[in-house]
């Protein structure tokens, strides 16, 4: 029996056994988990019933509460009622996820510690399409975001998902699922405006072509207003983003469906390169310690370079850096980004209950990081087959195979400040064209072939065991096997205990593996020349290997209260850390957990919250670049049937933003967001929100050694107006 049939039977049972949910406790035979699921099902449109399960870590769809994993589900109301603009903002309400803002257009997301400020060590998919940028190992959250009207859910699976999802699903998986075109019929509009001029507008139109085929298209425009850095100077982070997309769904037969979809995104902003400590003067004859040339000048050291002759293209200083007072020198350049993709999917169910899907993806991504003179175009083609089948009432098998081809066209140039004669030891000559990043003749074409199998068995009515492995052969990593095992034990109809082990791998980014980095230039006072300093690419970098151990307990004391506890320990070998003078690898251990609750105190009051703790050790030393403790609390109170008072509180522990020369401490902070949401009609929603109300501003994050300092995350007031279908 598939999940749609199970949901329909559950609704039929409810209608026959009770008149309404006020008598839910009289539902004989339903556990508190099932009662809570029933309440949610009755609130859904009938067309959405087939899309309520979670894809899970077992390779087939099961109800959320049966998953032997730490899972958090974000739905559209979790975005709109909490005053979030983008999907990534809603991750702040997920225990264990650390979401920060740099300047106005930069969002950073870390899951369960140890991924650095920019590099993502969890896997993100949008309708099955991996969105990790392989060049730098990052995700552009603006480019990958989607209109709220087409969002069905975001499944946040904390913990390694190696045996199903494979490489890069190290600390977890974010699985974004959009709605079927049949569920987006008509017109939808969403407008958001902040008091500082930041704006977002979305339009979605859906229609029906025939009895069995549906379509939609959508448009989005986003404007960024200019903010300030923590020193008070302009952040130069204004700009814009534009997006468009479409989807076509057709029912080819009673058990055969076809989907064709695509999208385009463009963004135009500026980004900075910190030059404050890039020209160095040696303090000893062996060139082992240095100070910036600007400091050497103020100290009156001998044989200094002449700015007008030896580095005439270098920008002038504009004040001082913070907190270390070094003369501030920076260079802003354009950072255009364009991306487009197409997706086709054929799916069905055979007569012997084999549920299968065949998906194809094509993607073109073009970006220029003008501030470091690095640009690339990526073409990618993917083919993915997945299937699952119940072998018996107590035995379920999932399996799949996939292939990928990627090609890159990389171009590196010297940016304007660096165009002055410098000795390059790798060529033995003076050059004026040394780029910051040099991909050189490194490989530009990569193939990957993968397969997985997952076997889930009900050993008893209470115990479920699932074991599987992902097999991969790729040009980036060679051949790997990523095994995993999960079990769940139902004490009774209110308590589920689960555990898991996974061996997960993360591939180094192409910058880490293949790119030479010229990070500074040193003045040689004896010879009167600049000498380029660099660290070579690390083509011999191995994949990061992580053994993940997890335990969890899920308790639903009633249909109104869900409590979850998740504990984990990660043991990572060859974790990649970059910085002068080399790319280095370290052993990292991370231990932590999350405690969450979801409580419907009454028909008018809904509370959600969570606390997370995570402590990491790098080569035995405690890491300080990640907050050990974080907490969030969300409250939605219906003042009237159509008026909701929203309150969100977030606590984040202190941390230090690492840097090669200028570490920046970030104090712990408490954030309060308040909002009123009015729903004058069923499909209209008007919200007014105040965010970060406790402080006028605070810093959160920045790109290490690229940004000079973090931007201010300021108190903002937001007006949102939306009309649903």
What are these regions (language model features)?
Residues 163, 175, 182-184, 192, ...:
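Periplasmic-side early beta-strands and strand-to-turn transitions of outer-membrane beta-barrels
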Residues 26-41, 46, 50-82, 108, ...:
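N-terminal periplasmic "start-of-domain" segments of outer-membrane beta-barrel proteins
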Residues 251-266, 310, 314-319, 330-477, ...:
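Face-selective signature of the C-terminal outer-membrane beta-barrel domain
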Residues 130-158:
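Short acidic/polar hinge/loop motifs at secondary-structure boundaries
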Residues 206, 624-725:
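Conserved C-terminal beta-signal and adjacent last beta-strands/turns
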Residues 458-465, 563-573, 583-659, 694, ...:
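Gram-negative outer-membrane beta-barrel transporters
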Residues 353-368, 490, 496-498, 533, ...:
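Membrane-embedded beta-barrel scaffold of Gram-negative outer-membrane proteins
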Residues 53-72, 88-130:
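Extracytoplasmic beta-strand/coil segments of soluble accessory domains associated
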